[in-house]
């Protein structure tokens, strides 16, 4: 496979220099409601739920299958693109793959990649504190969607200005998306998914639009689950002192982003999980494929020994879905990494 994995020595040095996260906290604050956002999110979800109803009553099967395909494409655009490539730089991508991922990410419409990366790097640096945009210490609803319905916490504004995203601003592909955000993202996320069923196989405008909205809110909410459910429910086999958890349900919904305790301990691993090539981690397979054809390279991983030592030192003792799980077959434990 055409990939260059970072050496264990470098990774171990990075591990030793990792700054301990602040203790999860949520100080008292007065929420300033953004009514425009509430109305917008309410419409999206009402329209999406109506789209779900139409799927069972009048929508053509071609439209349903097309929307599911777009759901998968958009989700990979977020996980393999804005998350693993641009936020954490877990691998490098040549221009064709960057363009492809930018378009796929636009289909998800979760702000521009530049804004997404800024918020996500802030989230990792100040995870589950008042400087975290979607602080899970404030509960499920706030970390899931509530943070988007109110003004940003002062600490988020202050710390956000200190986050280095110069590498992202210097990327011409992402600058294009930022400059033409409204027409470009609007066309990719809403217009084309509506027009294609109408002109492609004679779907009604009502069905096409509302099923497109259903696909959109599904993409939103499965991503939101990483911020909420995967920070509240689950085991913590790698670091028991942080909120991010291993949540299998979230992994299924997001195609592999629910191994969140691992990800917060080893954010530079392109697999975002210890067992990165299992069936729940489609973005890893996506990246591996493009590494095979030469569009992705310098894939970074973590050594098994490093994972084992960190788990023993700071984990909660569960170590589910890991090589130290007592139920893991011996032949898997003895398998050598790539």
Swiss-Prot record:
Residues 318-338 are annotated as: Disordered. GO terms for cellular component: endoplasmic reticulum membrane. A motif (Histidine box-1) lies at residues 83-88. CDD domains: Delta9-FADS-like. A motif (Histidine box-3) lies at residues 260-264. Its main location: membrane. One of its GO terms (molecular function) is acyl-CoA 11-(Z)-desaturase activity. Its cofactor is Fe cation. A motif (Histidine box-2) lies at residues 120-124. The keyword Transmembrane helix applies. The chain crosses the membrane at residues 33-53, 61-81, 97-117, 181-201, 212-234. Detected in the pheromone gland. Disulfide bonds: none annotated. This is Acyl-CoA Delta(11) desaturase. It is an enzyme of class 1 (oxidoreductase). Its EC number is 1.14.19.5. InterPro entries: Acyl-CoA_DS (IPR015876), FA_desaturase_dom (IPR005804), FADS-1_CS (IPR001522). It is a multi-pass membrane protein. GO terms for biological process: fatty acid metabolic process; pheromone biosynthetic process; unsaturated fatty acid biosynthetic process. Belongs to the fatty acid desaturase type 1 family. Keywords: Fatty acid biosynthesis, Fatty acid metabolism, Iron, Lipid biosynthesis, Lipid metabolism, Membrane, Metal-binding, Oxidoreductase, Transmembrane, Transmembrane helix. Catalyzes the formation of delta(11) fatty acyl precursors in the pheromone gland, and has high activity towards palmitic acid and stearic acid. It catalyses: an 11,12-saturated fatty acyl-CoA + 2 Fe(II)-[cytochrome b5] + O2 + 2 H(+) = an (11Z)-Delta(11)-fatty acyl-CoA + 2 Fe(III)-[cytochrome b5] + 2 H2O. PROSITE patterns: FATTY_ACID_DESATUR_1 (PS00476). The keyword Transmembrane helix applies.
């Amino acid at each position: 496979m055409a990939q260059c994995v970072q050496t264990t020595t470098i990774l171990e040095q990075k591990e030793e220099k990792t700054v301990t996260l602040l203790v999860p906290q949520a100080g008292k604050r007065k929420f300033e409601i953004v009514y425009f956002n509430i109305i917008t999110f309410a419409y999206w979800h009402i329209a999406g739920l109506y789209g779900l109803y139409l799927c069972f009553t009048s929508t053509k099967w071609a439209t349903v299958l097309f929307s599911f395909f777009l759901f998968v494409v958009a989700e990979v655009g977020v996980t393999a693109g804005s998350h693993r490539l641009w936020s954490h730089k877990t691998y490098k991508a040549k221009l064709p793959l960057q363009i492809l991922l930018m378009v796929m990410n636009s289909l998800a419409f979760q702000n521009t990649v530049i804004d997404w990366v800024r918020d996500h790097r802030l989230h990792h640096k100040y995870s589950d504190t008042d400087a975290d945009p979607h602080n899970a210490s404030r509960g499920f609803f706030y970390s899931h969607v509530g943070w988007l319905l109110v003004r940003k916490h002062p600490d988020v504004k202050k710390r956000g200005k200190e986050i280095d995203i110069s590498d992202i601003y210097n990327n011409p592909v992402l600058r294009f998306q930022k400059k033409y955000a409204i027409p470009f993202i609007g066309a990719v996320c809403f217009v084309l998914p509506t027009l294609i069923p109408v002109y492609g196989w004679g779907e009604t405008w009502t069905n096409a639009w509302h099923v497109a909205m259903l696909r959109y809110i599904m993409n939103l909410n499965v991503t939101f689950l990483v911020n909420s459910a995967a920070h509240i429910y689950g085991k913590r086999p790698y670091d028991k002192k942080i909120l991010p958890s291993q949540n299998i349900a979230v992994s299924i919904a997001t195609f592999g982003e629910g191994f969140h305790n691992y990800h917060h301990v080893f954010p530079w691993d392109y697999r975002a999980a210890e067992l990165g090539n299992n069936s729940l981690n489609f973005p890893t397979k996506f990246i591996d494929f493009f590494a095979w054809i030469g569009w992705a390279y310098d894939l970074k991983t973590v050594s098994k020994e490093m994972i084992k030592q960190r788990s023993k030192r700071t984990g909660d003792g569960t170590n589910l879905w890991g090589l130290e799980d007592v139920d893991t077959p011996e032949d898997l434990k003895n398998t050598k990494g790539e």
